[in-house]
Amino acid sequence: MVPRLSAGTPPASPARWLAGRLAVVTGASQGIGAATAAAMAAAGAHVVLAARDQHALDEVAGRINDAGGQATPLPTDVSNEAAVQRLFAEVAGVGQVAALVCAAGVLTPARFAETTSAMWDETLRVNLTGTFLCCRAAFTAMVPAGEGRIVTIGSLSGVYATEKFPGLAAYNVSKYGVIGLTEAIAVEGKEHGISAICLSPGAVDTEMLRRANPALRPGLTPDDVADLIVALLDSRLAPASGANIPLFSNA
């Protein structure tokens, strides 16, 4: 059984664990990543923003810094191992990474029989391999500190026994993989004080989803997801480490 949370009922957050800590958010140029970076900065974290689009990344960082937060943009292709290594080397120059949120992702809808090898490879390379590369780098950096918190982004499309839709074969597989990866990180992170949790939202009103399915009416906003991520990071994650939390519609 997985716990079911709605966007309107985030867990209590009596203390700001994030305050004064260094965090990395991938996919931070738009959507869930951008909203999460802003929410984490508002909670007092110094947020390193990672994404491929430098212009969009600079805009997000500018808004956060103008609002009194602290954000450092570092353009990165999370599917490139060397780029991820450079990212975390630069992060180490800033300070000790305490939290990672993996929100980078792609969605290219295609019927199963029409899914090309290139579509398949790109989806898994960004959504799953990119998450693996960033989690591995962050995990390695967190071990000496004896603590760390990792949040990955799955999807209801990757949750067993939820309704599935046509055209999402590669995407669904990538998100099933992210959920399994998070469980593995939690198992090995326990002895190092590192917690990992996966948040699997339903349809979120993002540019990526609008491009993929303009007719879909999302029941969640990026801020809904971001607020829950911050609440989770500010709470004691250890007892729930390894869990996958489905996030259902706010409607």
In which residue ranges do the predicted regions lie?
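Substrate-binding pocket helix/loop in short-chain dehydrogenase/reductase
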Residues: 111-112, 119-124
